[in-house]
Amino acid sequence: MKKWIGITLGICMIWVLSACGSTPAVTETTSTTETAKNKKIASISIFLTGDLMALGIKPAATTTSDYLPITGEQYQGIQYLGFTKEPDMEALIGLQPDEIFIDAEFADKLGLDKLEQIATTHVINLDEGRWQDHLRAIAQIVDRTDNAESFITAYDAKAKEVSALFKKEIGNGKVLAMRVSAKGFRIYGMDRPLGPILFEDLKLNPSPDVTKIDKNWENISKEILPDLDADAIFVLVSSVDEGSDQVFEKLQSDPIWLGLKAVKNQKVYMITEQPWLDYSASGNLQALEQLEKLLSEK
């Protein structure tokens, strides 16, 4: 794979005009490169950033999503490249990274040949497998497989502890995760971001209707909530859509909400978008730690 050491103004102009010459396409890879130590890595995905950090690698730059701001101590010193959907390509070129990691969802949209002219590019398909698979794939690339296995072992132990704590609260009761925003209500299915951590890692029992959702989430009306018959509800309130807090405040006085089994039994658990929607190794570990703290305070 080609990797340009010098970045010139001509490249910037070529990028803007989308007139780059033909270069080999980048394919998904599990080949091992030299260790990532001292390498300058750019991550075109906040989720891949979380996986890299779980391996002890702090990327030089990252993109993110509007609902996952890169605030917090762990992101200090990392250059912000904008949103993953529309990254700041000029800043990426100026960074002169050694390697780029990108989510397959956005690789074709941004142009793999153009990314490859900047640096060796690794494509990870986050829609295939679970976060453990993604972590292992990245670990193979950066030669940190031992780190990946150690992380997963520690994570599994933490998940077992937190699961036991939660089941003391609800036993084998049915669980539901929902998001409240000014645009409406949604419930999360069995797939990422929340399905795997809740129903696979923590081994909680999903509400039967949750298992029928064949996508990441499904929009619903509040009138549907009683039919879901959840014994416990995880609630996220959108930080992006203005007025979402007011919508949730109004919902809490609604007879439909007040009549829910989980509400009457005080089994509503307020969680936050960061880290719960950060479907990465480090994001999921932080989510477990947040839930553990939440349960200890009840």
Language-model-detected regions and their locations in the chain:
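Extracytoplasmic substrate-binding proteins
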Residues: 114-183, 278, 282-298
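His/Asp/Glu-enriched short active-site or ligand-binding loop at hydrolase and phosphoryl-transfer sites
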Residues: 66-67, 194-216
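Proline-aspartate-enriched helix->loop->beta-strand connector
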Residues: 96-102, 120, 225, 229-233
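A short, structured surface patch at a secondary-structure boundary
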Residues: 45-94, 99, 104
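Sec-dependent N-terminal signal peptides of Gram-positive bacterial secreted proteins and lipoproteins
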Residues: 1-25
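Structured C-terminal subdomain patch of bacterial secreted/periplasmic proteins
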Residues: 40, 232-298
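Basic- and aromatic-lined ligand-binding clefts that recognize polyanionic substrates
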Residues: 40-52, 150-205
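N-terminal, intrinsically disordered, polar/charged segments of Gram-positive cell-envelope systems
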Residues: 23-40
